[in-house]
């Protein structure tokens, strides 16, 4: 008899435990009414940076900005943009040209182990931009000189960043990315075309981020 009582008690305890677990599993949840350990943390940051790339096989400088909303310390969503110009070695009385312009768009950034002092991020930019050719002597006092040509383009730029948490509100990121475009149609002058893939290429950069991460 005692064995039967023990078996019955064990079955009842098992049923009760299972029911309680099922009740917790099936508990109604909503986006705006969460337990403390389920709440999503929100933050944001602004950033500026400087970088190096090549455009039409010539050295070029990049100046960039970013503004992003940070979700749960692990994903950043926002906007980003960069300005650029190449052919930095100016030769007096030269008929060479700059390529100058900029691009920007939607910015998506997964962040891995954000709270670690050193961690990784994988930024992706999708957007568009514009580019123009500018003669080296454009800035001289000659009102007859103008930029010869311009074009617009689509851009997709994935990258990787090594981030350093300097203090709670400030991070430094060393990054590399690759800029893909749909090509550009430009002429330096009537007899010389800009390569269609002149904008495609690797970038390296240094970013300074300020905000709540």
Over which residues does each language-model region extend?
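Predominantly the C-terminal beta-signal and adjacent terminal strand-loop region
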Residues: 165-213
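Hydrophobic, lipid-facing positions within transmembrane beta-strands of outer-membrane proteins
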Residues: 44-46, 61-65, 102-106, 152-160, ...
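Bacterial Sec-dependent N-terminal signal peptides
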Residues: 1-30
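Extracytoplasmic loops and strand-loop junctions of Gram-negative outer membrane beta-barrel proteins
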Residues: 47-51, 92, 141-146, 188-191
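Gram-negative (and chloroplast) outer-membrane scaffold detector with strong preference
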Residues: 74-156, 164-168, 207-212
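Outer-envelope beta-barrel architecture signal
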Residues: 38-46, 73-75, 116-122, 168-172, ...
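Short glycine/proline- and aromatic-enriched beta-strand/turn motifs that initiate or cap beta-hairpins
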Residues: 21-72, 209-213
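Outer-envelope exported proteins of Gram-negative bacteria
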Residues: 66, 121-127, 173-177
